[in-house]
């Protein structure tokens, strides 16, 4: 077994503020003066389990509506506040943390309809803003969820563009609810094209060309949304310009198709619909439907939920799927939906020594491995032939390497103990990386040196 540690030549501490207002001794005096914490009464409640008495002296605190519990909470809050307020360095710590966190953040860009999009947070905004960038107009705010409500309680997620980039659909949540609506806009004019879809929960938005999209939800529960049981997820197809009541139920309408979570992916050529169905967050079944065949039959790829599987890319008539089926560290397989038997599966990226996280973009596959807590990224073609190992800026963590098949450049984010997250461009044909956006963090990583050191443990490993 390997052990390692990272040594840092210099250490930044919050007590290195410009003008600390009190010494440790002064703080200790003030904290002592703040007084001790209030006492908590012990009750006499006893439970008996299988003939054994189990005292539960604080059972009375479980009644959060009682006057005694309310009084106890008030006393605890008062005591805690007096303790915190007595820490004279607290304001300095607050200023330092605010200075280190209040800087502009940006995500790696993505493309839709040939237009570049990215998210940006100016520093302390509640929600990041979606921007678009064109050669003639430069950067423009495209969607700003901070303006969707006066009190900031409406959030945006799941932004998804149609194939040609002319339409965008996104989900809105009010007050943190899992029940959401889907809004559809015209990208050029910004106009909302139709009434929002409602009562959507735990859903993606997967477009089929420019005609409409697949989404998932449960039947609207009777009574409380917070306590009602939702255990049969259903996949629908919404055709643009039609009412939600006319949406086609694609999967999940029968007992045989009953699952708690159902999602959809469409292959790059629009031919195959791949449905993931699961009853937990680990393991899923996979079904495929040939949208060009005209029949509603589902082809079963993963018959049970013993492993995870998800569509990564499509290549000719083959589906490239990342899975840990018979491969705990993960692998990428090619499956012909017309020959779905596992004996016909082809390893594209076989299981290796390290856990695999695969992405696709620009007509290539990128295998991301975590090796001794450091990212290693290898580029393959869609047939599984290794192209190169990607040279990263330093020892650290890289993520991204995904995009459309026709993209000429891909983007990834890199960070480590010294480098705040920065965005790099990868030329997938040459394997060259260049800095695209440096971090705006005020943290000066050049003051530090990071090393990775290995040593033998007591048992010699």
Please tell me what each predicted stretch does.
Residues 121-128, 149-153, 172-181, 196-201, ...:
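A flexible loop/linker signature enriched in serine peptidases of the S9 family
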Residues 13-16:
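C-terminal motif of bacterial Sec signal peptides marking the signal peptidase cleavage site
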């Amino acid at each position: 077994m390997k052990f390692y540690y990272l040594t840092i030549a210099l250490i930044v501490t919050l007590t290195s503020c410009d003008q600390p207002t009190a010494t440790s001794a002064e703080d200790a005096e003030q904290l002592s003066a703040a007084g001790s914490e209030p006492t908590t009464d012990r009750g006499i409640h006893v439970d008996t389990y299988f003939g054994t008495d189990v005292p539960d002296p604080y059972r009375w605190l479980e009644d959060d509506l009682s006057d005694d519990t309310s009084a106890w909470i008030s006393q605890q809050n008062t005591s805690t506040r007096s303790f915190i307020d007595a820490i004279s360095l607290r304001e300095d710590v607050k200023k330092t943390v605010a200075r280190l966190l209040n800087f502009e953040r940006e995500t790696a860009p993505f493309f839709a309809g040939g237009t570049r999009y990215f998210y940006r947070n100016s520093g302390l905004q509640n929600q990041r803003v979606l921007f678009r960038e064109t050669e003639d107009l430069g950067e423009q705010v495209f969607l700003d969820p901070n303006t969707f409500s006066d009190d900031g309680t409406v959030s945006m997620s799941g932004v998804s563009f149609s194939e040609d980039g002319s339409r965008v659909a996104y989900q809105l949540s009010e007050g943190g609810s899992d029940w959401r609506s889907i809004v559809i806009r015209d990208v050029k004019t910004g106009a909302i094209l139709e009434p929002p879809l409602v009562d959507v929960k735990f859903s993606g938005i997967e477009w089929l060309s420019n005609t409409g999209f697949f989404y998932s939800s449960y039947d609207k529960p009777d009574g409380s949304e917070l306590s009602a049981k939702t255990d049969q997820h259903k996949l629908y197809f919404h055709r643009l310009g039609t009412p939600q009541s006319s949406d086609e139920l694609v999967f999940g309408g029968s007992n045989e198709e009953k699952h708690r979570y159902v999602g959809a992916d469409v292959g790059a050529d629009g031919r195959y619909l791949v449905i993931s169905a699961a009853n937990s967050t680990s393991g899923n079944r996979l079904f495929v439907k040939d949208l060009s065949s005209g029949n509603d039959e589902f082809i079963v790829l993963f018959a049970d939920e013993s492993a995870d599987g998800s569509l990564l890319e499509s290549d000719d008539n083959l589906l490239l799927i990342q899975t840990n089926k018979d491969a705990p560290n993960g692998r990428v397989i090619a499956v012909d939906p017309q020959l779905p038997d596992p004996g016909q599966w082809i390893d594209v990226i076989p299981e290796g020594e390290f856990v695999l996280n695969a992405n696709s973009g620009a007509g290539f596959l990128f295998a991301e491995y975590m090796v001794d807590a450091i990212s290693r990224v290898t580029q393959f073609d869609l047939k599984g032939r290794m192209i190169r190992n990607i040279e990263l800026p330093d020892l650290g963590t890289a993520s991204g390497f995904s995009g459309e098949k026709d993209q000429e450049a891909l983007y990834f984010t890199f960070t480590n103990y010294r480098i705040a997250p920065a965005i790099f461009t990868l030329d997938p044909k040459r394997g060259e990386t260049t800095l695209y956006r440096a971090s705006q963090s005020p943290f000066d990583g050049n003051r530090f040196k990071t090393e990775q050191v290995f040593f033998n443990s007591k048992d010699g490993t």
